[in-house]
């Protein structure tokens, strides 16, 4: 019984490495994303702006889902990091695409337009799901 318990922790160091790198990539994504948007998501969310909450939540999930896929399918930590950065770039591209499709979106989300926030969040999540599926190599 003692050996079985010990063997269960055999991959714990890998778990910690992948988790730490995932959290670093998530923090990097948040830092970059909130800087490329012309509004202050966290301040807006604290004020109760549902549009900002929808858009940021969708972007976070749209990044986390492919990042989880990268963790699951990568052959090494470096491979996972590369695919994590690709997932980050895809989410930034999704935001830029939304801005091109609906130029007023960067004004309407801070104004509390829930429909626009929901659209951006859904677009981000959808692109993230597609990215995750494409990473299942």
What are these regions (language model features)?
Residues 1-12:
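Short, strongly hydrophobic alpha-helical membrane anchors
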Residues 16-20, 80-85, 118-119:
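Hydrophobic alpha-helical transmembrane segments
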Residues 30-44, 94-108:
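C-terminal ends of transmembrane helices
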Residues 44-57:
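Loop-to-helix transition at the N-terminal end of transmembrane alpha-helices
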Residues 59-71, 122-137:
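Hydrophobic alpha-helical transmembrane segments in multi-pass integral membrane proteins
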Residues 68-96:
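Short alpha-helical packing/oligomerization segments
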Residues 88-97, 121-130:
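Mid-bilayer segments of alpha-helical transmembrane spans in multi-pass integral membrane proteins
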Residues 104-124:
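Interfacial loop-to-transmembrane junctions
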């Amino acid at each position: 019984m003692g050996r079985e318990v010990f063997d269960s922790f055999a991959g714990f160091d890998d778990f910690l490495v992948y988790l730490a790198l995932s959290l670093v990539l998530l923090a990097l994504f948040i830092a970059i994303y909130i800087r490329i948007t012309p509004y202050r998501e966290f301040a807006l969310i604290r004020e109760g702006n549902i549009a900002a909450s929808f858009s940021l939540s969708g972007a976070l999930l749209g990044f986390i889902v492919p990042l989880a896929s990268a963790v699951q399918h990568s052959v090494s930590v470096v491979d996972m990091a590369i695919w994590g950065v690709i997932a980050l770039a895809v989410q930034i591209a999704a935001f830029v695409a939304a801005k091109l499709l609906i130029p007023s979106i960067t004004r309407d989300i801070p104004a509390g337009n829930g429909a626009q926030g929901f659209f951006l969040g859904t677009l981000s999540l959808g692109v993230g799901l597609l990215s995750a599926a494409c990473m299942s190599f």
